[in-house]
Amino acid sequence: MFNIPAVAVSYLIGSLSFAVIVSKYYGMDDPRTYGSGNPGATNVLRSGKKKAAVLTLLGDAAKGLVAVLLARVLQEPLGLSDSAIAAVALAALVGHMWPVFFGFKGGKGVATALGVLLALSPATALVCALIWLVMAFGFKVSSLAALTATIAAPLAALFFMPHLSWIWATLLIALLVLFRHKSNISNLLKGKEGKIGEKR
């Protein structure tokens, strides 16, 4: 049985948009107003502030990790099922993509998804991270690296995740991330997608 409070807390944690928070801290423009308009680390990097981009990446990944780890630590005391943990994982990503604190205008979810996967299955997260790194360094296109790693996630989950509900959650997470990258997919097909760090 899903625990509604646990899912709600996870959604609220996911709703913390570190791209906006970090940018505001450094006196930068709201990342939703320049570049791709996406409040994520890649777009923050376009501002030229590498430290802000790194902090955004770490913050977005950490919130996914913390939301799911918190639920796993409290799983027995709260009587949370494995399916409830899967729902918590999804809620963190949904919060990032449609954050209640920022007008439901969120990011594409790559870093948060990685944090969620790290909490569910470190091996799955490691596979995805390695694929992202290879693709990013090889092609210098963030979205291509993200899409490749995203597609690999459910396949890796089949081998490394212990619960079927978590595998299904990983598949849904991958589909959500792919959905949020639909404009990037279109640009890739047209050969118009920008390189990492390139200003628009």
From Swiss-Prot:
The keyword Membrane applies. Its main location: membrane. Pathway: Lipid metabolism; phospholipid metabolism. Keywords: Cell inner membrane, Cell membrane, Lipid biosynthesis, Lipid metabolism, Membrane, Phospholipid biosynthesis, Phospholipid metabolism, Transferase, Transmembrane, Transmembrane helix. One of its GO terms (cellular component) is plasma membrane. The chain crosses the membrane at residues 2-22, 51-71, 84-104, 114-134, 159-179. It catalyses: an acyl phosphate + sn-glycerol 3-phosphate = a 1-acyl-sn-glycero-3-phosphate + phosphate. It comes from the Bacteria. Its EC number is 2.3.1.275. It is found in: Cell inner membrane. Probably interacts with PlsX. Catalyzes the transfer of an acyl group from acyl-phosphate (acyl-PO(4)) to glycerol-3-phosphate (G3P) to form lysophosphatidic acid (LPA). This enzyme utilizes acyl-phosphate as fatty acyl donor, but not acyl-CoA or acyl-ACP. This is Glycerol-3-phosphate acyltransferase. It comes from Neisseria meningitidis serogroup C / serotype 2a (strain ATCC 700532 / DSM 15464 / FAM18). The gene is plsY.
